[in-house]
Amino acid sequence: MTTPNKTPPGADPKQLERTATVREIGSQAVWSLSSCKPGFGVDQLRDDNLETYWQSDGSQPHLVNIQFRRKTTVKTLCIYADYKSDESYTPSKISVRVGNNFHNLQEIRQLELVEPSGWIHVPLTDNHKKPTRTFMIQIAVLANHQNGRDTHMRQIKIYTPVEESSIGKFPRCTTIDFMMYRSIR
């Protein structure tokens, strides 16, 4: 059982993108849900609007399935939850699983959330801080606050590390022979 990374209240994952060390890759995946109320599905979960949400409609566990076309490196999962707005619909226990498909998913994180308000940053790294490579991520809501039945999740973002490009990173020319060719006339 782990506790998610503590971030300042309202720490927007877009701040991660501004560091140019990660980029959001949710649009490259196929998203599916175990259930949803009409008008409260994947579109609301991915619309960048914190006022909209996915609402499940069925028995627990409630599942969000995220499938990539190729094996993908994932570093961080960000979930927006708001206990003040959602009360008993707010998740209190979440499991994050990864694998090649539905049949070989393995749990890599289980989170206990206590009245969350804002972005929850979940590292998807191994013990050596190395990002996970996977075809599929599954987020399972195992329990809600106040023993609520259905759940609300307002947003989910998935981030991959940005690989440094070698373009523009040439060794310094220090010898006389190299310095002769360092500029174009």
Curated annotation (Swiss-Prot):
Residue ranges annotated for the DOC domain, each copy included: 2-185
Biological processes, Gene Ontology terms: anaphase-promoting complex-dependent catabolic process; cell division; protein branched polyubiquitination; protein K11-linked ubiquitination; protein K48-linked ubiquitination
Highest taxon in the source lineage: Eukaryota
Keywords, alphabetical: Acetylation, Cell cycle, Cell division, Mitosis, Ubl conjugation pathway
Positions bearing N-acetylthreonine: T2
Modified residues (N6-acetyllysine): K169
A Gene Ontology term for the protein's cellular component: anaphase-promoting complex
Pathway it works in: Protein modification; protein ubiquitination
Function: Component of the anaphase promoting complex/cyclosome (APC/C), a cell cycle-regulated E3 ubiquitin ligase that controls progression through mitosis and the G1 phase of the cell cycle. The APC/C complex acts by mediating ubiquitination and subsequent degradation of target proteins: it mainly mediates the formation of 'Lys-11'-linked polyubiquitin chains and, to a lower extent, the formation of 'Lys-48'- and 'Lys-63'-linked polyubiquitin chains. The APC/C complex catalyzes assembly of branched 'Lys-11'-/'Lys-48'-linked branched ubiquitin chains on target proteins.
Similarity section: Belongs to the APC10 family.
Record text on subunit structure and interactions: The mammalian APC/C is composed at least of 14 distinct subunits ANAPC1, ANAPC2, CDC27/APC3, ANAPC4, ANAPC5, CDC16/APC6, ANAPC7, CDC23/APC8, ANAPC10, ANAPC11, CDC26/APC12, ANAPC13, ANAPC15 and ANAPC16 that assemble into a complex of at least 19 chains with a combined molecular mass of around 1.2 MDa; APC/C interacts with FZR1 and FBXO5. The C-terminus of APC10 binds to CDC27/APC3. Interacts with PIWIL1; interaction only takes place when PIWIL1 binds piRNA. Interacts with FBXO43; the interaction is direct.
Name of the featured protein: Anaphase-promoting complex subunit 10
The organism of origin for this protein: Mus musculus (Mouse)
